[in-house]
Design a protein with these regions (language model features):
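C-terminal effector modules of nucleic-acid-centric enzymes and ribosome-associated factors
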Residues: 1-219
């Protein structure tokens, strides 16, 4: 709570309640999502307050969300356990227990990131159908757009691991692709590949030049 007083002559000008003393971003007034968030922080259960703190910037470590929530340590831990056991919070990575440094994401946050990953990869496969996948660095850069802060390398890698386990995508050493995506040639491309392979077999020690591969009958 806070009170604004005039020192001389002594007079109380007003006062109020600070709902979120450490906001991670600016919120636009009068928007339904802003009002709903403030109502949760003001009157919600500890689990609702904890999940609201998580949603500011996720995924995050359990310790970080505890600190954001403003709840007492024991109350924050109980709130997290309630959210986790109820399926509203998901552990990432290899963590199976809610340790302080475990990364966690809300069910709603995961749905949003999963949909964004799928959309980015689908768009990439449409634009570059002959590529096996999207470079990890490029995918992270796209995923960071619009976020309050970039994903840490650990958070990004653990999100990819969770997404792969959920059947959303597949990860190789350097690239990421949608689950089930394979490079497929058009009939014209397949015919060209067949001609080039035949040319290599006919002249294994003097393979065709790049120009001859592009123009089989000569430039």
């Amino acid at each position: 709570h806070f009170i604004i007083r005039q020192p001389s002559p002594s007079h109380t000008l007003g006062g109020g309640l600070v709902i979120d003393p450490r906001p991670a971003r600016r919120w636009r007034r009068f928007r339904p999502e802003t009002i709903s968030r403030l109502e949760t922080l003001s009157h919600g259960t500890p689990a609702e307050i904890w999940l609201q703190a998580l949603s500011r910037d996720e995924p995050a470590t359990v310790r970080t969300v505890h600190e954001r929530s403003g709840l007492a340590d024991s109350l924050a831990q109980a709130a997290y356990l309630e959210a986790w056991q109820g399926g509203d919070a998901v552990l990432l990575g290899a963590a199976t227990e809610p340790t302080p440094e475990a990364l966690v994401i809300s069910r709603g946050g995961w749905s949003q990131i999963s949909a964004r990953l799928s959309a980015i990869l689908d768009e990439t496969h449409r634009a570059y159908p002959l590529r096996a996948g999207m470079p990890k660095g490029e995918l992270k850069s796209r995923l960071d757009q619009g976020r309050a802060a970039p994903l840490t390398p650990r958070a990004f890698n653990e999100l990819l691991g969770y997404a792969e386990g959920a059947g959303v995508l597949q990860v190789s050493e350097a690239a990421v692709r949608r689950a089930g995506h394979t490079v497929t040639f058009t009939p014209a491309q397949q015919a060209l590949v067949k001609r080039q392979l035949a040319a290599f077999q006919q002249q294994p020690y003097t393979p065709p030049s790049a120009a001859q591969q592009r123009y089989p009958s000569g430039p």
